[in-house]
């Protein structure tokens, strides 16, 4: 990542927010905890009497207008599930300005003024682009097993991924030691 991009992301994370209608999306590779995060966002919005929309398939869904209302009932039983109920994608189209403009238009047509993006490095870069190119309030929630985001400590999913790998290694070692192969 170039220094200029870090600066843009730093500025983007310090914007003031005034949320009325919110869209939330997951993007890029999935990470453990995305559904739990999504559930928390939807419940918080509902408790504050805000309209909340879910974007299916990440940035591709923004471009294709796959934006639907979400209720607490729809996210009520997802906390223990892996992946993302909203699905994710990596979008090459979103890198083109005309498709970003279409994505922004799709949000504003539904009177959405705030976007929450749950994802890793590429997702957060995309969120920074939207923040820069629109009047939308944009919040990036880092969720990546790679822990490759600048200026960010632990991310949603990193600790779970590391501990899952460690448990698997411990089990393999235990199995190997019982057959005298170690």
Describe the function of each predicted region:
Residues 178-182:
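Conserved anion/nucleotide-ligand pocket segment
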Residues 6-18:
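Short, Lys/Arg-enriched N-terminal segments with co-localized hydrophobic residues
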Residues 36-41, 121-136:
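Short Gly/Thr/Asp-enriched flexible loops that form oxyanion-binding sites at enzyme active sites
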Residues 62-117, 123, 154-170:
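Glycine-rich oxoanion-binding loops at beta->alpha junctions
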Residues 53-55, 131-155, 159-164:
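Short, acidic/small-residue loops that bind anionic groups at enzyme active sites
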Residues 27-30, 55-61, 90-91, 120-123, ...:
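Short, ordered loop/turn segments at secondary-structure junctions
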Residues 17-63:
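N-terminal phosphate-binding or glycine-rich loops at protein starts, especially the Walker A/P-loop
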């Amino acid at each position: 990542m170039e220094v200029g991009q870090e600066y843009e992301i730093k500025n983007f994370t310090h914007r003031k927010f005034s949320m009325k209608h919110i869209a939330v999306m997951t993007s890029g590779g999935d990470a453990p905890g995305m559904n739990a995060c999504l559930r928390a966002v939807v419940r918080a919005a509902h408790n504050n009497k805000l309209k909340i929309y879910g974007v299916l398939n990440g940035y591709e869904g923004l471009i294709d207008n796959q934006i639907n209302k979400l209720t607490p009932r729809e996210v009520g039983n997802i906390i223990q599930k892996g992946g993302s109920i909203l699905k994710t994608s990596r979008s090459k189209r979103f890198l083109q300005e005309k498709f970003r403009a279409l994505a922004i238009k799709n949000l504003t047509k539904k009177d959405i003024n705030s976007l929450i993006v749950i994802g890793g490095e590429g997702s957060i870069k995309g969120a920074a682009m939207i923040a820069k190119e629109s009047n939308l309030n944009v919040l990036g929630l880092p969720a990546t097993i790679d822990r490759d985001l600048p200026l960010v400590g632990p991310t949603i999913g990193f600790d779970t991924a590391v501990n899952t790998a460690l448990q698997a290694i411990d089990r393999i070692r235990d199995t190997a030691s019982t057959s005298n192969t170690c």
